[in-house]
Design a protein with these regions (language model features):
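Enzyme catalytic cores with a strong preference for nitrogen-chemistry domains
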Residues: 1-359, 377-386, 418
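ATP/NTP-dependent adenylation/nucleotidyl-transfer catalytic domains that generate, transfer
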Residues: 173-175, 232, 244, 258, ...
């Protein structure tokens, strides 16, 4: 449970219709197995104690008493485990029968939740046996279940009864859940909506959804969409083997979802359980940011419980490259969309400013290459010739033959206007003017070149009536790896929300899909070139200054950026996730070293982001001071850095 990870399970026992003792035994056996796996919240199907398909047997007092006694057995057998277990059973209340979920923990019932929407169409006849809960105020239940099998008072069965119950952990308030049952989710106004608005971060759904062609896909979409709309975890547990097959078949379809993403899903007819960890801290963070997620003051009752906080072993998938989709097909679709968004953003800016040209500095590196490709796409959208793109290569002290050659080849392949302006003499003169020793390879030596290049581009833009197109990316902005008023500045930055790890995929996708052989070959060579600003002199014609040797691997920094900024995780949690995701790739000391670098630079370099040029947002993480990220330039990093120091 540390860092907000709650290990949860959806489990489908093999039942026998109307055999409550057998069903209780199956539930207990599965629950004990889940408890050994450190599960803290286990959900079983709708009416699993009796079976969903009992039909008119639900009227029988014998069955209802059997369900009650089975619940008592479950309470007794699971009382020693630090795991909340939620089971389904029929309950009589005020002379009416309700289809209910019972929430059990440490030998007591915490609450009973009745079903609100009863299907009574096609194959369903629930209204024949059950009454729909009218949504009225929750009441403390002291009637039918207030005595045990011997007629003695049994306080363990007394609990609140009603649909508006929210169960919340005393020692971790983000661990809170509400319950709906099967058809409740399929209704126009699912109860989970108001439960989430009242603070439930996880929704449980005890279900008995029969299988038929196409239904599993629809069911999955309902669960995922509801979890996304509610910014919640969603545990869906459906009935399976053992239910009557007189007219229907049940597949035991179990799903654990989180904010629109599937964490775990069972195969149909597997009759098993699925386990994953729902990150309630992540959900709480997202809700804090979302101003549309408001409390509507519904009539609910909070049921508090205490559960020991332990380290949860992470088993859910944690991507090393969170900005990149899991599948190759999805990555290609994402790349196509991003390239289109970038091009349309630039198209609008060029048209609005009546710019005659798009001026761009070309180095032969990934960032400027992507920006050039975006310029080409924008010109296509505008129906203008590629010669309206003025690409400028500006070799100086650190330029290598490889990068210069690639820059020229790309420009020739696309057909842009190419200008080569060697800035060596200009920079040397500038050093003479300010009295800087050319052999002093300090930050003055590096930044002087970057600012000279920007000056050249700005003046050419004025000369040609154009706009300077920025090439800097999101990863560089996060680290402040840009020269202030040098490559930091442009008139429109097309890469401003593209992280370095994604840029490689965008260029690779362009290479795969282009019919231009020369362009394809050049792009492939650029993809193999080390990332470098090329501001220090080359060594034997090879790049001597490799960015990742200086600031750290970009795959680590992009991981830190996504988890630390997108989800607001603490450095401690980011570190824990990095250790898990990069196991075998980087050791603890390496990850910790670059994590400290990330936070130190992220805070100290905000002043560069505070005056960022315009550029299109394409993903969920962006650092524009006018949009998603507003931070004072003089904020202190002490809290974050001190937490990192404590990790050593």
């Amino acid at each position: 449970m540390k860092d907000g990870f709650i290990k949860v399970a959806a489990a489908t026992p093999e039942i026998k219709v109307a055999d409550c003792k057998h069903n209780a035994k199956q539930i207990i056996s599965l629950a004990k197995e889940l408890a050994k796996k450190d599960v803290k919240l286990a959900v079983f199907p709708e009416l699993c104690i009796t079976g969903y398909t009992c039909q008119d047997l639900f009227y029988q007092t014998t069955l209802l008493d059997g369900a009650k006694n089975a619940l008592i057995t479950i309470l007794e057998e699971l009382s020693a485990f630090d795991m909340i277990t939620v089971v389904g059973l029929p309950m009589q209340y005020d002379s009416k029968l309700y289809n209910c979920a019972a929430v059990t923990y440490h030998g007591k019932v915490l609450g009973y939740v009745p079903k609100q929407y009863l299907p009574n169409y096609n194959e369903f006849y629930e209204m024949r046996h059950f009454t729909a809960w009218d949504g009225s105020k929750c009441e403390y239940f002291l009637n039918w279940f207030d005595t045990d099998a011997d007629g003695e008072c049994d306080d363990s069965l007394s609990a609140y009864f009603g649909a508006g119950l929210i169960f919340c952990c005393n020692n971790m308030h983000d661990f809170s859940f509400g319950i709906e049952l099967c058809e409740d989710l399929w209704s126009p106004c699912p109860p989970s909506t108001y439960l989430a608005q009242e603070g439930a971060n996880i929704i449980l759904n005890l279900s008995a959804s029969n299988e038929m062609i196409g239904k599993s896909e629809y069911r999955r979409s309902l669960v995922l969409n509801q979890s996304a709309r509610l910014i919640s975890g969603y545990i869906y547990c459906s009935a399976g083997e053992g239910e009557s097959t007189q007219d229907l078949v049940f597949s035991g379809h179990n799903i654990i979802a989180e904010n629109g993403a599937t964490l775990a899903e069972s195969e149909l007819f597997s009759n098993d359980y699925v386990i994953s960890e729902i990150d309630v801290n992540k959900l709480a963070f997202e809700r804090r940011k979302n101003t549309s997620f408001r409390n509507d003051k519904c009539d609910t009752e909070t049921i508090w419980f205490d559960i020991p906080l332990t380290d949860t072993k992470i088993t859910r998938f944690v991507s090393r490259t969170p900005f990149i989709p899991y599948s190759a097909d999805e990555t290609d679709k994402r790349c196509e969309l991003i390239l289109s968004m970038q091009a349309h953003g630039l198209k609008k800016r060029l048209a609005h400013t009546y710019a005659k040209t798009a001026v761009i500095g070309i180095s032969g590196g990934l960032d400027s290459t992507l920006a050039l490709l975006v310029c080409a796409n924008a010109m296509k959208l505008l129906g203008r010739p590629m010669t309206d793109i003025v690409a400028v290569t500006m070799p100086c002290f650190g330029t290598t033959k490889r990068t210069k050659s690639n820059a020229v080849k790309i420009c020739e392949a696309i057909g842009v206007t190419l200008r080569e302006i060697d800035i060596t003499d200009s920079v040397k003169q500038h050093f003479l003017d300010i009295g800087h020793d050319i052999n002093d390879l300090s930050v003055v030596f590096e930044n002087g070149q970057a600012r000279e290049r920007t000056k050249v581009l700005m003046n050419i833009a004025n000369q040609t009536g154009g706009l300077v197109i920025g090439t800097g990316d999101l990863s560089e902005l996060a680290l402040g790896w840009a020269t202030y008023n040098g490559d930091h500045m442009s008139m429109y930055g097309v890469n401003c929300s593209i992280p370095k790890t994604l840029i490689k995929h965008l260029v690779s996708y362009y290479s795969k899909t282009t019919d231009n052989k020369l362009l394809k070959e050049s792009l492939e060579d650029i993809l193999d070139t080390p990332v470098s600003p090329e501001l220090l002199p080359a060594h034997n014609g090879e790049i001597s200054q490799k960015t990742e040797d200086l600031v750290g691997p970009y795959e680590l920094h992009d991981f830190f950026l996504y988890n630390g900024i997108r989800w607001g995780f603490t450095p401690e949690k980011v570190f824990r996730l990095a250790l898990y995701a990069f196991d075998g790739a980087y050791d603890r000391e390496t990850i910790l070293k670059w994590l400290k670098t990330f936070y130190r630079r992220f805070f100290s370099q905000q002043f560069k982001r505070s005056c960022l040029p315009d550029g299109p947002k394409v993903g969920s993480v962006t650092l524009s001071p006018r949009g998603d990220w507003r931070m004072p330039s003089d904020a202190c990093a002490t809290l974050w850095l001190s937490q990192i120091e404590n990790l050593k």
